[in-house]
Each structure stands twice: as C-alpha cells, then as structure tokens.
Amino acid sequence: MKIGIVTGIPGVGKSTVLAKVKEILDNQGINNKIINYGDFMLATALKLGYAKDRDEMRKLSVEKQKKLQIDAAKGIAEEARAGGEGYLFIDTHAVIRTPSGYLPGLPSYVITEINPSVIFLLEADPKIILSRQKRDTTRNRNDYSDESVILETINFARYAATASAVLAGSTVKVIVNVEGDPSIAANEIIRSMK
C-alpha cells in the first residue's frame, strides 16, 4: 500500500479529516485503511502497564515512549505490506509535547520502518484549534491550552516533518483544515497521494 502519514497538533481535526478521506475513497471503490499510531502505542503501553490512556502516555519518560514508537512502527509496516494495492493513512503527530521537551513523532527508527510517500501537516489557526479542544471533553489536553503553545508546536512539527522526510525520501505537504468542511482537506490529501 502507498503510505501517507497525516500529522497535526491535538485538536486540529486529523481524525475527522481522515474519516472523510476514508468515506471518499470507499465511495470511489479504492482500497484504503486508516491506522491510528497512538492506538498501536497504547495497546503496548496498556499491556506493559506504562499508562492507562493516551493523555497519560504522552507524559511517560522519553525512553518508554521510544519503545512504544518502535513497536508501533513495526506493526504498522507489517499491515502496509499485507494490505495490497491502495492507500494506507497513518493518523499521528510529528512531535509530542512532553515534560522534558518535544519528542519527534517520526524519528529515524520510525520513519525508515514505515517509509511513507507523503508526510502531511494538517494545520489550522491556533484559535480554531483551541476552540476544538475545548469542545472535546473526552480528552485532557491542558498541556496545549494556550495559543502560543499551539503555534510553537505547529512550528516544531514542521521542522520535525521536514527532517523525517529527508530520511524517508518523502514529500511534505501542509494542508489547512478549514473550519466546518473537512472534505476540502480530505480531497487535497487524496490528490497528493495519486
């Protein structure tokens, strides 16, 4: 499967846009799969007793997060190899804000295992992201609860995605998630993968 990694800060709308990507490709009869990187990491974290949920997982030591990243990359690469023709999209983050600094979400040991065609940076105005975060009561994102922190994280994500693309030989594409119409970003992602 051709792989696209869709990154973005928590609250930017990755899951919503990727659901729209899936809907569009399904309607076109194109084989596709959406994988959430955090789901793979969380399954291992739960099994090892590292964390009880995603928000707790973000606060783990860098060493533990690296182990979880490696295990997830191997599992996702295997799914891509077994998937046949079509598209595999990975919902993840280019950087993770931790108590000890920004942890690259796609370091060399992850990006070379997955080997994507495109790394997408899904972005939106920090005010819009903050508003979306406040509406999502299912998550605890108080570590991203300030516009300046959101902007800083977006900038670090751009740097990290570019560095990862160099290692994988993939392209990087910034896509704006327009408020109220995720199909605009979804169609742009699909066009970039063809």
From Swiss-Prot:
Belongs to the archaeal adenylate kinase family. This is Adenylate kinase. InterPro entries: Adenylate_kinase_AdkA (IPR023477), P-loop_NTPase (IPR027417). The keyword Nuclease does not apply. It is an enzyme of class 2 (transferase). It comes from the Archaea. It is found in: Cytoplasm. Keywords: ATP-binding, Cytoplasm, Kinase, Nucleotide-binding, Transferase. Pfam families: AAA_17. It catalyses: AMP + ATP = 2 ADP. Its EC number is 2.7.4.3. GO terms for cellular component: cytoplasm. Homotrimer. ATP binds at G8, I9, P10, G11, V12, G13, K14, S15, T16. Signal peptide: none annotated. One of its GO terms (molecular function) is ATP binding. It comes from Sulfolobus acidocaldarius (strain ATCC 33909 / DSM 639 / JCM 8929 / NBRC 15157 / NCIMB 11770).
